Design a protein with these regions (language model features):
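Short catalytic-loop micro-motif centered on adjacent basic/acidic residues
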Residues: 1-3, 74, 182
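A contiguous active-site-proximal alpha/beta segment in oxidoreductase catalytic domains
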Residues: 1-40
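Residue-level signal for the nucleotide or nucleotide-sugar donor/cofactor binding architecture
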Residues: 9, 53, 160, 183-186
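A short, charged, Gly/Pro-tolerant segment at domain boundaries
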Residues: 36, 187-190, 210-224
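Short glycine-enriched, charge-decorated loop/helix-capping segments at active-site entrances
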Residues: 45-49
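Contiguous beta-strand/loop segments that form the cofactor/metal-binding neighborhood of enzyme cores
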Residues: 53, 59-139, 156, 163-178, ...
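Glycine- and charged-residue-rich phosphate/anionic-cofactor binding loop of Rossmann-like
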Residues: 150-154, 172-190
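Short arginine-rich
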Residues: 194-205
């Protein structure tokens, strides 16, 4: 399975910093990924709403940082443009080890803005220091503020990190032992399960519908003709 965020240089840099004790005890994991990406009805419907199709990766990375299982959660979502399913969701809660989390994900971020942008970050807060990351899909910036070290690292974003996945898989074959850096099928199943659980929890609360289907039609039409945009589905001849 390719839980690709686990293979990214920025998340591994932050996790190594945490392991060094630079931020004290891990206390809070905050993850946000909002883009004007895949719109409802464009495809991927078999993968479910945005928070499952895309959001499960952020569910996984929060659990990966915490090193523990989800214990409690409360989710709020919005049915943007009066679409049948929520396309934005925020969930907060706790892990069994006491670490607190919040995850925000949605492809609703300025879909019809003249110049599109996004908001994607991870914010890791400890009892003594912090570590955080932002990216623009081209370059990632990691800022580390520990008790003895302060760093600001800028490197290429890295995309889906397929090269790292292949390298780890090849090493596992050559040694006959699965690399500990490779996720198990169980990890993917848990990420999927809890993405669905958070969606189900949101449906149990007030689920407002804001906007109109006509706006969604305009979004789809714009994305159909865009040459450069977020998460465009390429048509092959």
């Amino acid at each position: 399975v390719n839980l690709y965020l686990r293979n990214s240089w920025y998340h591994n840099t932050i996790k190594d910093f945490i392991a060094q004790g630079e931020i004290g005890e891990l206390a809070i994991v905050r993850v946000c990924h909002m883009t004007p990406g895949l719109a409802p009805g464009e495809g991927h419907e078999y993968e479910g709403p945005s928070f499952h199709d895309c959001g499960m990766h952020y569910v996984d990375i929060a659990r990966w940082y915490a090193g523990s299982e989800f214990k409690t959660w409360n989710a709020q979502a919005v049915r943007m443009w009066n679409y049948k399913d929520p396309w934005w969701l925020q969930c907060h809660g706790t892990f069994e080890n006491g670490v607190v989390f919040d995850i925000t994900q949605g492809h609703v971020y300025g879909q019809l803005a003249e110049t599109q942008t996004h908001n994607s970050y991870v914010d890791i807060i400890g009892t003594k220091g912090i570590a955080r990351m932002t990216h623009d899909f081209k370059t990632a910036i990691v800022e580390l503020h520990g008790v003895t070290q302060t760093h600001r690292l800028i490197q290429p974003y890295g995309g889906k990190n397929i090269d790292t996945l292949c390298k780890l898989f090849a090493e596992s074959i050559e040694t006959g032992r699965r690399s500990e850096a490779l996720p198990e099928f169980r990890d993917a199943a848990i990420a999927s399960e809890y993405a669905w659980r958070f969606l189900q929890d949101a449906r149990g609360h007030d689920l407002p519908a804001i906007g109109e289907l006509e706006t969604l039609r305009q979004i789809r039409e714009r994305r159909r003709t865009m040459k450069n945009g977020y998460g465009l589905l390429r048509k092959h001849a």
